[in-house]
Amino acid sequence: MIPQTMTAVEIREPGPPQALRAVERPVPEPAPFEVLIQVAAAGVNRPDVLQRKGVYPPPAGVTDIPGLEVAGEVVRLGEGVYEPALGTRVCALVAGGGYAQYVIAPAVQCLPVPASLTLEQAAVLPETFFTVWHNVFERSRLQKGETLLVHGGSSGIGTTAILLGKAFDARVIVTAGSAQKCAACRELGADVAINYREGDFVEATLRATDGKGADVILDMVGGDYLARNAAAAAVEGRIALIATQGGNKSELDLRPLMMKRLTISASTLRAQPIANKGRIAAALRENVWPLFETRGLKPVIHARFPLADAAGAHRLMESDTHIGKIVLLV
């Protein structure tokens, strides 16, 4: 029986991790084409931290409860939903509400939990797999044998990009901020790991590619990295900007972009229409989900926290010492 109330984590007011607190909230009702999921685990992502700080508010009409990805069991169907069925174990991309015992999700944004994964492993798939697939493979068209440069290789996005890049037979170069993180990236499959604190990633990338440069660059830094990415890119290279952790503004000489015929794309995931995210989910199910069985794909989980200690999970994320994903157990 589904209760009327649930435990959820809310942001008391914008601020430090201790602004997160566990409260009682009504269990949400699924609208048409939505499902209600009893959450077993929820992934923690950088946008959650930005929302807590007050600089990345949820889209209009979305719950103020943070959390963009979950895994659990479908326990109620909205009108018009035929798949997933009641009782199905799913992971889902949500626009908010993941830090709770129950969450609603558009049915088209739900994916079955791969048979080889636990619910907590499945909970950390949606945000990074949707992001990497959409930006690296759809928008940037990474091909077999090409070189992918990934900034922040030890992050959740970065480790996912390594896994998928290698699964689709690309050469993967990453940047990371310590010898330990570089070693972890190589162990995961990265061909080259560059410690950006000890050397210039542009020079290292060109050296690793015999002067050609990277065909696709996945950048979550922004700022002055945009011009440096252009220098590290190959002719006809594609640069995908997905975050601006290093700054929102950049100054660059446009001539190298034209001479190299570069393509720069930029996107966020959360505000995209449900139809777009449903299409990405369908593409993942067709192209990536089989790889959990055939290639043994598994996400990298650094740490697990109880839902009541979401603040601890945020403190770990802000320390930048984690490798891979952080998960809340509900």
Residue ranges and their predicted role:
Residues 26-44, 55-97:
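Glycine-rich beta-strand-centered segment in the early N-terminal region that forms part
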Residues 176, 224-296, 329-330:
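Glycine-rich phosphate-binding loop and adjacent beta-alpha segment
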Residues 85, 123-198:
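Mid-domain Rossmann-like dinucleotide-binding core that forms the NAD(H)/NADP(H) cofactor-binding site
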Residues 201-211:
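Short amphipathic alpha-helix with an adjacent loop that forms part of the alpha/beta core around
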Residues 2-4, 275-330:
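C-terminal hydrophobic helical "lid"/dimerization subdomain
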Residues 98-101, 176-184, 201, 249-254:
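Short, glycine/polar-rich helix-capping loops at beta-to-alpha or helix-loop-helix junctions
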Residues 50, 61, 89-154, 187:
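NAD(P)H dinucleotide-binding glycine-rich loop of Rossmann-like/cofactor-binding domains
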Residues 89, 147, 171, 237-238, ...:
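Short glycine-centered segments of the SAM/dcSAM-binding site in methyltransferase folds
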